[in-house]
A protein has these predicted regions:
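A short hydrophobic beta-strand segment most commonly corresponding to one strand
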Residues: 75, 89-106, 216, 230-247
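A short, N-terminal "cap"/entry segment at the start of jelly-roll beta-barrel domains
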Residues: 1-28, 39, 111-166, 178, ...
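Residue-level detection of beta-strand-connecting loop/turn positions
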Residues: 13, 63, 151, 202-204
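Short acidic-glycine-tyrosine-enriched beta hairpin
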Residues: 64-78, 203-219
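Glycine- and acidic-residue-biased ligand/ion/polar-headgroup-sensing regions
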Residues: 45-57, 184-196
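A generic "binding-loop/recognition-motif" signal
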Residues: 45-46, 64, 80-81, 90, ...
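Conserved short histidine dyad/triad with adjacent acidic residue
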Residues: 28-43, 166-182
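Asparagine-centered strand-capping/turn motif at beta-strand->loop junctions
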Residues: 84-87, 226-227
Length: 263
């Protein structure tokens, strides 16, 4: 059973919500006003990622420890030893990505043991890959720029087989792709600023997504989007697994897992 949309904790001190729970992708929202974090660990089978939305967190990658504030994306590949810690009682919040999901949502709810969810705590230091293999960047300012025009900007933040993560900016009235589907991966969006107008499902039903809104199209679900304005819009886009999305952004003639909506 999928835990998409379920809330584990919601109190003044903390909130933990499962935004998506799929075999290829788990996304959670976590907010905290208390200190603490998990111990050092690694994942052998999946990628772990963090999008800091509010406040500041200390992240350890290997033997490096740095404070990362709102607007930072971290993507941590398999076998990089890591942990995070909220060091203050001021509010912080982040999105946490697991790709593939490895039953992480059930682990949060206490239904799956850590090892069965690919969470290896106190790992042998010699097993760890170099911290330099992780990605840490300011998602509105850094990354691989593949499009930068007055009407839109697209940056690739991470390009791994398990996950492609991008940051995009559209001005008002900018159109996205027409109605389409993906057959072998899911496509998801988290709105940062402004609004996007999505068309979803067989009837391309229109939905307005404002800041903080999460939208996910599983395989074979028709979707399209545009910015109807009045303001500029920015968002994060997740493709899991990546299925060639980054290569398509670099070369629009590249054939990848995207198809026109069925008639």
């Amino acid at each position: 059973m999928s835990r998409t949309g379920q809330t584990l904790v919601d109190m003044p001190e903390a909130t933990v919500k499962v935004l998506a729970d799929f075999p290829d992708f788990v996304l959670t929202y976590m907010r905290s006003r208390s200190e603490g974090g998990p111990g050092r660990h690694l994942h052998r089978q999946h990628v772990d990622g963090f999008i800091v939305l509010e406040g500041e967190y200390a992240f350890e990658l290997g033997d490096q420890r740095n404070a990362e504030s709102a607007g930072t994306a971290l993507v941590i590949p398999q076998r990089v030893i890591h942990r995070y810690e909220h060091e203050t009682t001021e509010q912080g919040a982040f999105l946490n990505i697991h790709a593939p999901g490895c039953d992480f949502a059930n682990y949060l709810f206490g239904e799956t043991p850590p090892g069965d969810a690919d969470n290896i705590f106190e790992p042998p230091e010699e097993e760890g890959r170099p911290a330099s293999e992780a990605t840490v960047l300011r998602f509105a300012e850094e990354g691989e720029v593949v499009t930068d025009r007055s009407e839109r900007t697209i940056r690739i933040l991470a390009d791994l087989p398990e996950l492609c993560l991008t940051w995009t900016r559209y001005v008002a009235d900018e159109e996205g792709p027409g109605p389409h589907i993906h057959k072998e991966h899911l496509d998801a969006f988290f709105i940062l600023t402004g609004e996007l107008n999505f068309g979803l499902g067989p009837e391309v039903e229109r939905v307005t997504a404002r800041p903080g809104t999460f939208v996910l199209a599983p395989p074979d679900v028709i979707h399209t989007f545009r910015n109807d304005g009045p303001a500029e819009a920015t968002w994060l886009n997740f493709h899991a697994p990546s299925k060639g999305f980054a290569d398509f952004l670099r070369d629009n003639d590249f054939v990848w897992d995207s198809f026109d909506a069925p008639a």
